Design a protein with these regions (language model features):
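Helix-biased detector of long, well-ordered alpha-helical tracts
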Residues: 1-182
């Protein structure tokens, strides 16, 4: 969203330096931290992981859940779904202003099609649901979803881990949802 705004000559002076600094910052230290925790606990910390580039958060999460459910189906296990907290996602200052101005990246519409296919499914069978969906007005819900459809160019990491590691990871990572059985 930030770069789409820049291409439209919308300047976000309050966020520009923070965004650029984060773009050039390697995320290798986060991977190294996961390896350290795995060494400490003597077991795998991560069930699945991906970086959020191209398909936005929703697209990558969809791929992770569908892949897990294929494995689970072939092993006669109950399928999973994810409950997301739309207010757990952080955004740079000014990003929601850009969303309200209808600033979108070039991949937004294709990512929106992915979301629409997920969202039109009956809520009970949907692989991605939203914890606070019923308490939000439609405008706020759409703004939050727009954030999750933005194709990051240097995206953060999305990991799925066992709930027992939540307290260990919460200092440098943040929880945006939980995986539950369908």
């Amino acid at each position: 969203i930030y770069f789409a705004g820049q291409m439209q000559n919308i300047n976000m002076l309050g966020s520009s330096s923070e965004i650029i600094n984060n773009l050039v910052k390697s995320q290798q230290y986060l991977i190294d931290e996961i390896y350290l925790f795995q060494d400490q606990f003597k077991e795998s910390l991560v069930n699945a992981a991906t970086d959020i580039t191209g398909y936005g958060f929703i697209g990558h999460l969809k791929e992770m859940v569908e892949s897990s459910n294929l494995y689970r189906q072939s092993n006669n296990l109950e399928p999973l779904k994810v409950l997301l907290d739309l207010f757990a996602f952080k955004a740079y200052p000014g990003v929601f202003d850009l969303i309200r101005k209808d600033v979108k990246s070039t991949f937004f519409e294709s990512n929106k099609e992915i979301f629409d296919k997920i969202y039109k499914v009956n809520k009970q069978k949907r692989i991605i649901n939203f914890l606070n969906e019923n308490s939000l007005d439609q405008e706020t819900f759409n703004e939050r979803i727009s954030l999750l459809l933005d194709p990051q160019t240097c995206g953060p990491l999305l990991i799925s881990c066992n709930r027992k590691y939540e307290n260990v990871l919460k200092d440098k990572w943040y929880k945006v949802g939980e995986v539950v059985k369908m």
